[in-house]
């Protein structure tokens, strides 16, 4: 099951050799058959990565992302009541950058596209999303170290800056 809106990442598949298929900026659930010509051969495969082992057929285990998030993808410092957190002023450029990082849906296309199976784009997006905001600053260093350590522990590869992750990301998350 998936959201059919490109916001949950559960539909993650390789279609004709590309994570999420041939369209740019779209997830698998947003790819329609009308994109293909009559008689085309369509190859559908599960993600290919040691970090996402195949469970059965096209289903992969993506709980590694959950484990990375559990290692530090949250803010635990007290910011007051919910309305108090909303009163913290954040400059627009920083808020925009944090929102861009928050657009990562954790689908795994970056890992599937990377020849090393690196989850660095996912981890950096989640770390940036939280570390840019005032509420996340007190735990910024600990968060980054914990999430990177968990990524390494789970067997994801290292980044070699080929930018394949960025090219295949359906939400256009940038490595910079």
List the predicted regions and their residue ranges.
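Ferredoxin-type iron-sulfur electron-transfer modules in oxidoreductases and energy-metabolism complexes
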Residues: 42-176
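A generic, well-ordered mixed alpha/beta core segment in the N-terminal half of proteins
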Residues: 8-64
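Active-site nucleophile and cofactor-binding loops and adjacent substrate-binding regions
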Residues: 1-6
């Amino acid at each position: 099951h998936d959201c059919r809106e490109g916001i949950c990442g559960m539909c993650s598949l390789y279609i004709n050799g590309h994570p999420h298929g041939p369209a740019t900026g779209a997830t698998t659930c947003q790819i329609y058959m009308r994109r293909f010509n009559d008689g085309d051969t369509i190859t559908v495969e599960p993600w290919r990565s040691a970090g996402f082992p195949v469970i059965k057929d096209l289903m992969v285990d993506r709980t590694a992302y959950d484990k990375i998030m559990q290692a530090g993808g949250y803010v635990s410092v007290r910011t007051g009541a919910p309305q108090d957190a909303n009163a913290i002023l954040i400059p627009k450029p920083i808020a925009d950058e944090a929102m861009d990082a928050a657009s990562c849906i954790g689908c795994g296309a970056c890992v599937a596209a990377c020849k090393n199976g690196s989850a660095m784009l996912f981890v950096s997006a989640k770390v940036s999303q939280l570390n840019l905001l005032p509420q996340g600053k007190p735990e910024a260093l600990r968060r980054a170290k914990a999430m990177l350590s968990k990524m390494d522990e789970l067997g994801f590869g290292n980044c070699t800056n080929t930018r394949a992750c960025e090219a295949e990301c359906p939400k256009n998350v940038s490595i910079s």
